[in-house]
C-alpha cells in the first residue's frame, strides 16, 4: 500500500501511470458500482431492477458474503434459524437471477469441520455451512483451497506467489475440474499455473 500512496506524489516516476489508472477508475468503474449495507433480497431485487431500467444493462451481483445477507422481511429483521435464513437468501438470489437474467456471485463460509477436512479430504458440497440450499440452489460452486499437491507435470514451474487451486465442486452446465493458481497478494491477482 505504501507504494501506491507514494505514486500519488507528483514527483514520483509512476505518478502519470497512477493518475491514468485513477482517472480510468473514476470514469469507467466507479459509476458502475453500487456498494450497499445489509439488504434483503427484495431490496436487492429492486436495485437490480432499477439499474437494469436506467442503464439498459443487466448488472452482475456480488454478495460478500451469503451468511451476512439480511433475509428477513426487512434488512433489520433476521431469521432466528440460520438454515432458514440461508435457504431464503439462496431462493431470493435465484429469483433475482431468473427475473433479470443477472449473474449472481456469492461468497459463502464453510463449516468449521471443513477447515480440517480440507487439509486431507477432497472438498465437497457438504462443507458449505448452514443449509443444503447452497448445495442445490446454485448453478456452479467453486472452492478456493491451498495447493499443497505435487506438480502434475515434471516441467511445471514452481509457484511464484501463494499456491492455490480453484476446484469446481458443482457445474450444472458443464464438467468438474480444478485449476492451479498463484495468488499475488501485492497486486491482488491470480495467475494460472496450468
Regions found by a protein language model. Give the residues of each.
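NTP-binding/hydrolysis catalytic cores, primarily Walker-type P-loop NTPases
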Residues: 168, 173-194
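Cytosolic-facing regulatory segments adjacent to core modules
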Residues: 1-57, 128, 179-180
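Short, surface-exposed, polar/charged, turn-prone segments marking secondary-structure boundaries
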Residues: 13, 131-135, 193-194
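Generic preference for hydrophobic/aromatic residues in regular secondary structure cores
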Residues: 31-35, 142-144, 181, 188-190
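Generic structural "secondary-structure junction" signal
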Residues: 6, 71, 127-130, 183-185, ...
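P-loop NTPase motor core
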Residues: 37-165, 173
